[in-house]
């Protein structure tokens, strides 16, 4: 007599009791057998479902109803099971003991459970499969032993489990396949041995599992397979060998004639041999990406008529497209990260049912015609070497919805390349070399990406893309055509189209919503309603225009425009005048006047850059979006940016040098009562020019930050590199102003009262002090702006930032010459000398300057406080001028030994 018959006989008294009591037990009778703190409910079949999970139980509950069909004891603290604790539960079909502390299950623990179909023992501390406790559970269909510490499976532990369909042994410590234990599981259909430590699968490891359909062996340490390890698996359809240490292709799979899904990705397989799947005609899906595959036989995937998906990622050494003859059902093909340089012309003849083609990250240069692949819905060809898209490449692909051609070298696209793609919704052409884009056939696009095509500078009309929702452009100005530059999107309203509509008209239009006179009115109304919906959901275009990239004007506000024009005019005229008077009027140029002249020259460069920006604003007035991209990428923009930074830094460096020169001059005059030239002036000037040029060239070397905005200046926000550059400039200039301040503070501290007025050339000392004060004051807003950006302080409005960059920064270029013209007496003297020279040169162009009357020369020398003296000896003697209240002049001797030089005493 078998066990099931015994179970029926043992339950017969219970059945007789039920019959005597009038049939099925009442709900009240069932619930009286519910343990304390557990939740019980009828299952609709005269039986009881008992849930005692997560109650902290340390032992099995008592007083369980004999009619219990479902018992959940998971997530408790049960550490051991007594013999036959549940023998009376003859109707129990599902027992859950997961998440407890069981380390051992004794024999007889499940005795009497003749109806048990599901047993869950996962997440315990079992170190081996119970040797005898599971035997003779003839009704058991599902057994979960996963997430334990099982390292041993006794040979006879599964004997008697003739109905077992599903077995979980994953996430344990198995090191080998328990071949003997599996021989009694002839009805097993699904088994997982994943997440163990198995190294090898021997021959005939699953020999008696003829009904097995699913086998998971992933995440083990399998490095070798027996050539006949899968023999006997006549019904196997899914085999998972992913995430192992396989070094060779598993040729043992050729015996699996019914295999439909095969995965062996993330291994160390280096090659796939010819006719690798010759014994697997039923294969539908193959996953073998993330293997260091170097060689794939051309016939490896031939004659797989059921194959639907083929995925091969990261096969970096594949150079030829595989031969797919006889694999006509393929719907998805992914071959990425290889070195395929060309596709066969017959690729679509072999794959007429292809729907998804992913050949990204290859070396494709030329493309065949895909017109035969009528079912293609998605093509991904990004990151290749494609140069040209011909007219027939994508012709008549009526089902194509997504086309990705990003990160290629595409410079030419035939005007009709997209003309027969009515279903195309997503097109990605970003990061190519396009200068224009055809629009024929693209009316149905909803997503368009063109970013990274720096040669594509023209505007694209929004009328060509009526269904567009998302678009990415190379330049922000191109988004102006899609209305993103407006602050508020104005929704066209069919009830208020006219500004002069009367109340009666509005009433008629309102009534027209509910009463449509004829079909024509209905069509017009629907068209207007569709326009309103489109207005409610405008196109999302990026990068969007902003306060520094406007659609209509370069400067934006008239305050900035007038300020830039004023600075440009004053800087050019005043600095030109100062430069002329310094370098053309004087017979001899002292060190300080040379520095003043050079400051005027570099300030004139700043005026040139401001004038160019003002000219661009005037030329593009009202239509800057049409020229913004061209201007940003033009060489002129980079030249303007370079000149601005070079002029600004040179001016600061020269002013620093002038302050040091004045301090040196005053020190020498106080000590020797004579003026001594500043040492190594030419070398210092060359160093200043070199340093300023280097500072101005940094944005060019670091990726042309000058082209980041149409203002052609590094913006003190956004990219960390630009912010760091601006902060570095501010710190450098602040250091210069600190040096100047210290030098002049020492100068004034060492002078006694009245000494400054009695000094030679005191006007130049005062002039440099005035320049220092003015430039330092104007430097403060720039420094505040840069450090605010560094600290992410966002309370400064964009208009204020633009005003600082365009007006405050170049303002010293016009104030410096104005201060010299208005307050320095040397200018009037030099201007008079320049006028006399001009008058003289006009009267006598061929007469030498030496013919000037000696009296005029002497008078000019006195008026300009300059005299030309040639020293031919080491001892220098001259008369010093006396000031009011000072003793008469007396001769002085300079202790410095000099060669013959021109020297100008102070007056």
UniProtKB/Swiss-Prot annotation:
* All copies of domain LRRNT, residue ranges: 33-64
Residues that span the membrane, as ranges: 554-574, 594-614, 639-659, 683-703, 724-744, 768-788, 803-823
Give the positions annotated as glycosylation sites. Answer: 63, 77, 208, 500, 792
Those parts of the protein on the Cytoplasmic side are 575-593, 660-682, 745-767, 824-907
Q: Does the keyword Cell membrane apply?
A: yes
Q: What is this protein called?
A: Leucine-rich repeat-containing G-protein coupled receptor 5
Q: Which GO terms describe its biological process?
A: G protein-coupled receptor signaling pathway; positive regulation of canonical Wnt signaling pathway
- What kind of membrane protein is this, topologically? Multi-pass membrane protein
- Function according to Swiss-Prot or TrEMBL: Receptor for R-spondins that potentiates the canonical Wnt signaling pathway and acts as a stem cell marker of the intestinal epithelium and the hair follicle. Upon binding to R-spondins (RSPO1, RSPO2, RSPO3 or RSPO4), associates with phosphorylated LRP6 and frizzled receptors that are activated by extracellular Wnt receptors, triggering the canonical Wnt signaling pathway to increase expression of target genes. In contrast to classical G-protein coupled receptors, does not activate heterotrimeric G-proteins to transduce the signal.
What family does this belong to?
Belongs to the G-protein coupled receptor 1 family.
Q: Which InterPro entries match?
A: GPCR_Rhodpsn (IPR000276), GPCR_Rhodpsn_7TM (IPR017452), Gphrmn_rcpt_fam (IPR002131), Leu-rich_rpt (IPR001611), Leu-rich_rpt_typical-subtyp (IPR003591), LRR_dom_sf (IPR032675), LRRNT (IPR000372)
Quaternary structure, from the entry:
Identified in a complex composed of RNF43, LGR5 and RSPO1. Also interacts with other R-spondin ligands, including RSPO2, RSPO3 and RSPO4.
Which gene holds the coding sequence for this protein?
LGR5
């Amino acid at each position: 007599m078998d066990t099931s018959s015994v179970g029926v006989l043992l339950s017969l008294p219970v059945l007789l009791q039920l019959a005597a009591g009038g049939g099925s037990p009442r709900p009240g009778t069932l619930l009286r057998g519910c343990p304390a703190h557990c939740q019980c409910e009828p299952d609709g079949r005269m039986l009881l479902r008992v849930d005692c999970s997560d109650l902290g139980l340390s032992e099995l509950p008592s007083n369980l109803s004999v009619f219990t069909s479902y018992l959940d004891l998971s997530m408790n603290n049960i550490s051991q099971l007594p013999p036959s604790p549940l023998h009376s539960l003859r109707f129990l079909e599902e027992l859950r003991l997961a998440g407890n502390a069981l380390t051992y299950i004794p024999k007889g623990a499940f005795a009497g459970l003749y109806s048990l179909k599901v047993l869950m023992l996962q997440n315990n501390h079992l170190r081996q499969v119970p040797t005898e406790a599971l035997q003779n559970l003839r009704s058991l269909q599902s057994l979960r032993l996963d997430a334990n510490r099982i390292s041993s499976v006794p040979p006879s532990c599964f004997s008697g489990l003739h109905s077992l369909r599903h077995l979980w042994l994953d996430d344990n410590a198995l090191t080998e396949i328990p071949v003997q234990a599996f021989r009694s599981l002839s009805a097993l259909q699904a088994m997982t041995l994943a997440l163990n430590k198995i190294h090898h699968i021997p021959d005939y490891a699953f020999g008696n599992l003829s009904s097995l359909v699913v086998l998971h062996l992933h995440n083990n340490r399998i490095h070798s397979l027996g050539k006949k390890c899968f023999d006997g698996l006549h019904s196997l359809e899914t085999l998972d060998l992913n995430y192992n240490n396989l070094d060779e292709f598993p040729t043992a799979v050729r015996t699996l004639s019914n295999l439909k899904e095969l995965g062996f990705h993330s291994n160390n397989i280096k090659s796939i041999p010819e006719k690798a799947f010759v014994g697997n005609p039923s294969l539908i899906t193959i996953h073998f990406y993330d293997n260091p595959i170097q060689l794939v036989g051309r016939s490896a995937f031939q004659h797989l008529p059921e194959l639907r998906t083929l995925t091969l990622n990261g096969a970096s050494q594949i150079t030829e497209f595989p031969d797919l003859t006889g694999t006509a059902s393929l719907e998805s093909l992914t071959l990425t990260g290889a070195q395929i340089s060309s596709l066969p012309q017959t690729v679509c003849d072999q794959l007429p049912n292809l729907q998804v083609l992913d050949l990204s990250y290859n070396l494709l240069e030329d493309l065949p015609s895909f017109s035969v692949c009528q079912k293609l819905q998605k093509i991904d060809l990004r990151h290749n070497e494609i140069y040209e898209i011909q007219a027939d490449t994508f012709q008549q692909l009526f089902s194509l919805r997504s086309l990705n051609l990003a990160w290629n070298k595409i410079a030419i696209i035939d005007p009709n390349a997209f003309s027969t793609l009515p279903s195309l919704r997503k097109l990605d052409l970003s990061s190519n070399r396009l200068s224009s884009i055809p629009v024929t056939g693209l009316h149905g696009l909803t997503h368009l990406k063109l970013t990274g095509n720096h040669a594509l500078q023209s505007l694209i009309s929004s009328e060509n893309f009526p269904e567009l929702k998302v678009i990415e452009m190379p330049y922000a100005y191109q988004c102006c055509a899609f209305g993103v530059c407006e602050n508020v999107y104005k929704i066209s309203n069919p009830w208020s189209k006219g500004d002069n509509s009367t109340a009666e008209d509005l009433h008629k239009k309102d009534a027209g919503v509910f009463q449509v006179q004829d079909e024509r009115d209905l069509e017009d109304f629907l068209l207007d309603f569709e326009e309103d919906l489109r207005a409610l959901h405008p196109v999302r275009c990026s990068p969007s225009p902003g306060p520094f990239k406007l659609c209509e004007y370069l400067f934006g506000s008239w305050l900035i425009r007038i300020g830039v024009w004023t600075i440009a005019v004053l800087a050019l005229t005043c600095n030109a005048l100062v430069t002329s008077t310094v370098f053309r009027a004087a017979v001899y140029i002292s060190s300080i006047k040379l520095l003043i002249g050079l400051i005027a020259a570099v300030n004139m460069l700043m005026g040139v850059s401001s004038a160019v920006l003002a000219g661009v604003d005037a030329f593009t007035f009202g239509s800057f979006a049409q020229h913004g991209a061209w201007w940003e990428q033009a060489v002129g923009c980079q030249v303007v940016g370079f000149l601005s930074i070079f002029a600004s830094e040179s001016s600061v460096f020269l002013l620093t040098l002038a302050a040091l020169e004045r301090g040196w001059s005053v020190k020498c005059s106080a000590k020797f009562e004579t003026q001594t030239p500043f040492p190594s002036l030419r070398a210092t000037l060359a160093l200043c020019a070199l340093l300023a040029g280097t500072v101005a060239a940094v944005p060019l070397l670091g990726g042309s930050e000058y082209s980041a905005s149409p203002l052609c200046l590094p913006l003190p926000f956004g990219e960390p590199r630009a912010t760091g550059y601006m902060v570095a400039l501010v710190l450098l200039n602040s250091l210069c102003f600190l040096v100047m301040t210290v030098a002049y503070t020492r100068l004034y501290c060492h002078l006694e009262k009245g000494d400054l007025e009695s000094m030679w050339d005191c006007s130049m000392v005062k002039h440099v002090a005035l320049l220092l004060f003015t430039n330092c004051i104007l430097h403060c807003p720039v420094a505040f702006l840069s450090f605010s950006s560094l600290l992410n302080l966002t309370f400064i409005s964009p208009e204020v930032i633009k005003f600082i960059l365009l007006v405050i920064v170049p303002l010293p270029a016009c104030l410096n010459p104005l201060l010299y013209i208005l307050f320095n007496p040397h200018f009037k003297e030099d201007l008079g000398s320049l006028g006399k020279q001009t008058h003289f040169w006009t009267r006598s162009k061929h007469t030498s300057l030496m013919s000037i009357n000696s009296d005029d020369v002497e008078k000019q020398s006195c008026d300009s406080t300059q005299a030309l003296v040639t020293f031919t000896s080491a001892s220098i003697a001259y008369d010093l001028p006396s000031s009011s209240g000072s003793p008469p002049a007396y001769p002085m001797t300079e202790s410095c030994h000099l060669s013959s030089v021109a020297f100008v005493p102070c007056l």
